[in-house]
Structures are given as C-alpha cells and as structure tokens.
C-alpha cells in the first residue's frame, strides 16, 4: 500500500512538473516576445527623443534669434530717436544731407519691416511648437497614467501568480523531501526484504525437497490404491459437494436475521421520513388548509405519497434473502440468488430518490425565496440541499456494490473471485459514508427546526411535524450506524466465508455449477437418510427368480386378456348398433302390419263376409306371434323402451294401446322432445361460442395494444439510448471545450504578462525621458 501511495504521489509530482514545465515554456516565449517589443519601443522612443531634441534646438535658436532681433530693434529705435532731433537741427542744412538721411531712413524702415515680419513669423512658429509640445506632453501624461494603472493591475496579477507558484513550488519541494525520506525508508525495507527472501529461498529449498519426497510417496500410493482420479478438470471439481458445516450455516442465518432486523428498522425510518416530509410540504411555507400550495410542491407531495411502493420491497427482498439461507444449503455468493432481487428493489428505490431529488431541491429554494425565510434559515436550507445530494450519491454507490455482489449468482464472469474482498470493503465504506451523511442531515435539520420554531408564524402543526421528521432522521442515523458497525464487525467473517465451497478454496465456477452442487447435496442427504432406514424383509434370490418368471408370464397373459376384452367391447358395441337397427325395423314392420290388418278388416266389414274376417284375424294373430321376439312376449303388460343412437323411445304393448295413431303420436312426441333438447344444446353451444368469440376478440385487442405499447416502449428505449449517447457526446465536447478554454486562459495569461512587462519598460523609459526633459527645462 505504501509503494502504491508513493507511486501515486510520484505520478502527481510528474504531472505537476509537466504542467509547470509547459507553463515555463509559455512564459519564456512571452518574455522573449516582450523583450523584442520593448526593444522596438526603445527604438521608437529614441527616434522621438531625437526629434524632440531637434525641435528644442530649433526653439532655442529661434528664441536666441528673437532676442537678437529685439535688441536690434531697440538699438534701431534708439538711433531713430536720436536721429529725429538731429534732423530738426540740421534741417536747414543742404538738401543733399536731407536726401541722404531720407534714403537711410527708408533703408532702415525696410530693414525694420523685414525684421518685424521675421519676428512675427518666428513668434508664430514658437507658439505652434509650444502648443504642439504641450499637447504631446498632455497626451503622453494621460497615456502614462493609463499605463501605470494597467501596470498596477498586471503587477497584482503577477504577484498573485508568483505567490501561487511559489506556494506550489514550496509544497512540491516539501513533498519531494518527504518522498525522498520515504524512498530511503523503502530502500531500507527493500534491503531487509532481500535478506528475508534469501532466507525464505533457503527454507523453500528445504521444503521443496521435503514436499517432493512426500509427493512421490503420495503419487505411488494414489497409483496403487486409487482406481480413478476425477480432479483433473476444475469445472467438474466445482460440482463436488463440500463438507456440511452446520455451524457456518447457523452463523450465516443469524447474521442474515440481524441484517433483516436492521433493514426493517431502516425501512420504517425511511417511510416515516418521506411521509412526514410530505406532511411538512402541505403546511410550510404555505398551509394547504388556508391557501393552495405551489404546483412544484403538489407534484413533490404526489411523488412522496408513492414512497411505500418503493421502500417496502426492500424489506421483502431482504426477507426472501433471509428465508433462502437455511441449514441445508451452502451459502456463498454463487448460491444467494435472492440477492439479485434485493439489488433490483434497491435500484428501484434509487430511481425514486433520483426522481424526487430535483423537486426536493426546488422546494428548499422555494422556502428560501419566501418572506419568512431568514439568512440563517437560508444557510441551513442550502446545507440540507447539499446533504440530500450526498445521500442520493451514497445510495447509488451502495447499490453499485450490491449489484456487483449479486453478479456471481446470475452471471459467471460478471465479477472475479479475487475482487470479492475489495467489493465487500467498499460496501462497508459506503455504509459508513451513509452514516456520516445522515449525521450531517440530523445536525442541520435540528438547527433548521430550532430556527423555524422561533419564527412568529410557526404553528403547532409545523412544530409537531418538524419533531416527527427529526425523530425519523435520528432513527435513520441510528439505523445507518448500526448497519455500518454490524457490517464492519462481520467483514472479516464475510471475506473468510468466501472460501467455503467445493474443495475448500477452489470455489464455484458458475451459478449453474452451484445449483447443480446443491441438487447433488440434496440427493446425497436423501441417500444418507435412506441408508439409516432399517432393511425390510426380502425374498430369497432363487424364489425371486421364479416369481419373476411367473410375473412375466402373467403380464403377457394380462396383455392378451386386455386385447381380448378390447375386441369384445368393440364387438358388443357393433351388436348393440345392429340390435337398435333391427328393433327399429321391427317396430316399423309391426306398424305396417297393423295398418294392413286394419285395411283388410275394413274390406271384410264392407263385404260382410264373417269367414273372411275370422281368417284375417287368424292370419293377424299368426303374424303377430311370428313378428314378436322373446322380450316382447315377456313384457306384454309392461311398457317397451327402445334405445337407439338418436334417442330413447318408450311404447306400450298392443293390448293396452291398440290405436295406431296414439303410437305414432308417441314416436312424434319423442322425436319432438329430442329435437327440443338438441336445439337447447345447440343454443347453449351458440351462446358459448359467442362468448368465446367475444373473449377472443378482447384478447386480440389486448394483444394488439400490448404490441403497440411494446413498440412504443422500444421507441422510447431507442430515444433514451440516443439521448444518452447525445449527452455523452455533449459531455465530451464540453470537456474538450473546457480544456481548450483552460489552455487559452493560460496563453492569455502569458500574453498579459508579456504586455505587462512591455508596458512596465515603456513606463520606465517614459519616466526617464520625462525626468530628463524636466531637468532640461529647469536648466533653461
């Protein structure tokens, strides 16, 4: 672990060094560019200095010339003033002298006029040069002020960056010193490990020699004594039934019972928390009995009302898991199939938490925006919103690890056996994180409730609801702490119990092999139980062989008799059909005979021959006795019942009902009743067919609706997958854009440093030049 931490710190130092190196390259480039710009600005400043000096020299020469001209004008004016009285005195002299003085005066006037014009021109040039110099000086001063402000800003930025980089450099140097110390200690440990490895190698050689001797002895014993060896394939070894460890199973059932009790307490606390939160929304910040609450809180209350359908399955899933752990099973991750159900219920609850989290945050924001919310209450609400986010994140983390633990019972390659211990350790860490988050929620909510109780508008209902929520949060905190401590206390046992299985430590290969092993274990237990039963009295072997021959012969004769009985039944059914046929024929023939006798009797009555009548009666009696069978002769006074394939006919003898029409009426009534019965059966069958047809149509409609819903769900799933891919693309693009912006910001910072250094140098040069100019002006 120390080497891994050291390697991670080395990697972090290398990354920081690479970042600083890249920034150093950028800064070097910026410094070079800044130096080039400063050199160019220096050249420009020199050129401007030279032009300024030329202008100053011209101005000095002009002022000197102006002074000379002024002195010359004064001298000329003095000479003129002296010459005027002399001219008056000498006016009387000759005209030659006056003409001479007039010419000299004109020359002097012309010279004076030229000097005056030149002086005026020089004054104008001097004024323009002075104005231009003042304008340039004002412009340079304003630019100097702006540059000084910008330089101060850039200097502040540079100071902050230098401070930051110095801190990072000091931190890296300290880390480097620590890592050097650690590397020295690790080198010492490595030397000690080398010495230990040498000692272990010596011990290994001795053990290898000892074990090789034992192996040869064992191989010789196995080759001589063991007829077959089935330990070649690990897939088959996983099917071997392990030794039954009743203590282990009782311990696992006890642990599962404790976990079930903790989960039940946690489920009760979660139900109370969500229910009381729903009640609080109805009364604060707006009481629903007085005024309507916001649509957001209405939707949030509706979602919170459904919390039982998401929280209760957690208890049911844990109960099923507890019931699946019995004394007769082998409890490892590959056989705990019910853990997958608990993981699915936990996933559905986390989806519920994700669904209500935005509404919860918006509800807290709405409380902050209300007029009753103070600054302290607003701070507590912000802390609670952060705690709710952490709570959802902790539940998601816990569900991820539990889903990983449920993989070995469903997917063979979902989780490697070597990662079981790390996943269990992470589950314990997640439970401790859940406990910490619940402690923060309890602390912040108690502060929030205390602040709300001090409000002048706090009602008794709000105070009671806050107390209930606080008690449920405290119960959640206690339950989370109990579960975390329980899991931490049993973590070593969980990790150690993973080796419980076939061949002690080889483990199961797949859930199917674990299931087969459990079936083999049940069969082995049933076999061992059957061995405990006392043996029943058995038949001797010779007698059993004799009885077997008799049994075979009796079974053969039985099969033959069964065939004969079947043939006899078929013959009887055929004879019954023929009997019915001939009975109907006899009845029809009898009816025809009676009609014929009646016709003959009518004829005899008409002819009035008594002899013929007697003869006809004798013939009728003879024909009646010949046409009747033994059954009709015995049943003279009883009604005769005729059974056919189409129904049953009941008739009386000739002595009771001699009338032919009554007999025909009986047959007619019988067939009419049979027709009525068949029509009723037909109507019943029609009604059933209509009912079945309606049910089939309803089922077909439901099937069509189900197909449509299936298609809609597939479309939604496709859209969801597309949205997921789109969001992933957006995430990558935003990540890249942020990285580009960071690089651009670093480049911009370097360019700002360059401009800052340039402006600083320019300011220094301008200050120097302004100081030189001021000194020159003072000297002048």
Swiss-Prot record:
Instruction: Name the residue ranges with Low complexity bias.
Output: 95-104
- A Pfam family cross-referenced in the UniProt record is PPP1R21_helical
List of residues that carry Phosphothreonine: 652
What would be one Gene Ontology cellular-component term for the protein? early endosome
One GO term in the molecular function aspect is: RNA binding
User: Which ranges form a coiled coil?
Assistant: 1-207, 556-607, 693-742
The organism's place on the tree of life at top rank: Eukaryota
The UniProt keyword set, sorted, is: Coiled coil, Disease variant, Endosome, Intellectual disability, Phosphoprotein, RNA-binding
Task: Spell out the subcellular localization from the entry.
Answer: Early endosome
Give the span(s) annotated as Disordered: 84-104, 760-780
Domain notes per entry: Coiled-coil domains of PPP1R21 are essential for RNA binding.
The subunit structure is:
Component of the FERRY complex, composed of five subunits: TBCK, PPP1R21, FERRY3, CRYZL1 and GATAD1, with a ratio of 1:2:1:2:4 respectively. PPP1R21 serves as a binding hub connecting all five complex subunits to mediate the binding to specific mitochondrial mRNAs. Interacts with the GTP-bound form of RAB5A (via its C-terminal region); linking the mRNP complex onto trafficking endosomes for active mRNA transport. Interacts with PPP1CA.
Give the protein's function: Component of the FERRY complex (Five-subunit Endosomal Rab5 and RNA/ribosome intermediary). The FERRY complex directly interacts with mRNAs and RAB5A, and functions as a RAB5A effector involved in the localization and the distribution of specific mRNAs most likely by mediating their endosomal transport. The complex recruits mRNAs and ribosomes to early endosomes through direct mRNA-interaction. In the complex, PPP1R21 serves as a binding hub connecting all five complex subunits and mediating the binding to mRNA and early endosomes via RAB5A.
Disease in which the protein is involved: Neurodevelopmental disorder with hypotonia, facial dysmorphism, and brain abnormalities: An autosomal recessive disorder characterized by global developmental delay, severely impaired intellectual development, hypotonia, coarse facial features, and muscle weakness, often resulting in the inability to walk or sit. Additional features include feeding difficulties, respiratory distress, scoliosis, poor visual function, and rotary nystagmus.
Name under which the protein is recorded: Protein phosphatase 1 regulatory subunit 21
Its taxonomic placement starts with: Eukaryota, Metazoa, Chordata, Craniata, Vertebrata
């Amino acid at each position: 672990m120390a080497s891994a931490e050291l390697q991670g710190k080395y990697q972090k130092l290398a990354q920081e060094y690479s970042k600083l190196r890249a920034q150093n390259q950028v800064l070097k480039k910026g410094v070079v560019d800044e130096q080039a710009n400063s050199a160019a600005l220096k050249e420009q400043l020199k050129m401007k200095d030279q032009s300024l000096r030329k202008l100053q020299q011209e101005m000095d020469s002009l002022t000197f010339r102006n002074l000379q001209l002024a002195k010359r004008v004064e001298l000329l004016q003095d000479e003129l003033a002296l010459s005027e009285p002399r001219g008056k005195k000498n006016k009387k002299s000759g005209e030659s002298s006056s003409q001479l003085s007039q010419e000299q005066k004109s020359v002097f006037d012309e010279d004076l006029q030229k000097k005056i014009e030149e002086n005026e021109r020089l004054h104008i040039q001097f004024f323009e040069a002075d104005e231009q110099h003042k304008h340039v000086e004002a412009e340079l001063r304003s630019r100097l002020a702006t540059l000084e402000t910008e330089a101060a800003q850039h200097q502040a930025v540079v100071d902050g960056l230098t401070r930051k980089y110095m801190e990072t450099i000091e931190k890296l140097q300290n880390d480097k010193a620590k890592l050097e110390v650690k590397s020295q200690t690790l080198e010492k440990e490595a030397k000690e490990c080398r010495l230990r490895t040498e000692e272990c190698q010596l011990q290994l050689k001795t053990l290898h020699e000892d074990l090789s001797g034992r192996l040869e002895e064992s191989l010789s014993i196995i080759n001589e004594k063991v007829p077959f060896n089935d330990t070649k394939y690990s897939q088959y070894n996983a099917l071997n039934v392990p030794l039954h460890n009743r203590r282990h199973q009782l311990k696992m059932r006890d642990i599962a019972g404790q976990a079930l009790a903790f989960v039940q307490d946690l489920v009760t606390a979660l139900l109370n928390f969500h229910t009381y939160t729903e009640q609080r929304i109805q009364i604060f910040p707006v009481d629903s009995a007085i005024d309507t609450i916001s649509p957001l809180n209405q939707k949030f209350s509706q979602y919170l009302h459904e919390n039982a359908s998401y929280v209760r399955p957690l208890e049911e899933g844990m109960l099923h898991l507890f019931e699946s752990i019995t004394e007769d099973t082998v409890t490892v991750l590959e056989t705990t199939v019910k853990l997958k159900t608990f993981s699915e219920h936990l996933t559905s609850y986390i989806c519920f938490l994700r669904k209500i989290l935005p509404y919860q945050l918006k509800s807290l924001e709405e409380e902050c925006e209300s007029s009753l919310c103070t600054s302290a209450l607003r701070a507590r609400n912000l802390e609670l919103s952060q705690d709710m986010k952490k709570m959802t994140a902790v539940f998601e983390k816990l569900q991820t690890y539990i889903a990983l633990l449920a993989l070995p019972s469903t997917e063979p390659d979902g989780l490697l056996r070597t990662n079981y211990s790390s996943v269990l350790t992470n589950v314990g860490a997640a439970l401790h994180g859940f406990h910490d988050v619940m402690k923060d929620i309890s602390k912040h909510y108690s502060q929030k409730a205390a602040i709300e109780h001090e409000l002048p508008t706090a009602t008794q209902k709000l105070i009671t609801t806050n107390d209930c929520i606080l008690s449920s949060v405290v119960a959640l905190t206690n339950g989370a702490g109990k579960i975390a401590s329980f899991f931490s206390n049993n973590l070593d046992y969980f990790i150690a119990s993973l080796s419980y299985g076939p061949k002690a430590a080889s483990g199961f290969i797949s859930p199917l092999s674990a299931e087969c092993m459990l079936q083999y274990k049940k069969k082995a237990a049933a076999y061992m139980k059957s061995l405990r039963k006392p043996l029943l009295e058995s038949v001797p072997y010779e007698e059993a062989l004799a009885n077997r021959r008799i049994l075979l012969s009796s079974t053969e004769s039985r099969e033959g008799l069964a065939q004969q009985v079947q043939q006899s039944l078929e013959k009887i059914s055929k004879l019954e059909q023929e009997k019915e046929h001939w009975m109907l024929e006899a009845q029809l023939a009898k009816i025809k005979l009676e009609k014929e006798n009646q016709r003959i009797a009518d004829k005899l009555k008409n002819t009035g021959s008594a002899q013929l009548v007697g003869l006809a009666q004798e013939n009728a009696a003879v024909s009646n006795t010949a046409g009747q069978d033994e059954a009709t002769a015995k049943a003279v006074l009883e009604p005769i019942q005729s059974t056919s394939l189409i129904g049953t006919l009941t008739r009386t003898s000739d002595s009771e009902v001699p009338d032919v029409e009554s007999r025909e009426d009986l047959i007619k009534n019988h067939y009419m009743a049979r027709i009525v019965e068949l029509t009723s059966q037909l109507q019943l069958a029609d009604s059933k067919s209509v009912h079945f047809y309606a049910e089939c149509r309803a089922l077909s409609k439901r099937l069509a609706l189900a197909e449509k819903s299936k298609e809609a769900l597939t479309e939604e799933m496709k859209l969801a997958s597309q949205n997921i891919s789109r969001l992933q693309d957006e995430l990558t693009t935003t990540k890249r854009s942020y990285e580009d912006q960071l690089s651009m910001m670093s480049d911009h910072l370097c360019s700002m440093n360059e401009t800052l250094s340039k402006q600083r140098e320019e300011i220094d040069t301008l200050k120097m030049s302004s100081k030189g100019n001021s000194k020159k002006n003072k000297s002048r």
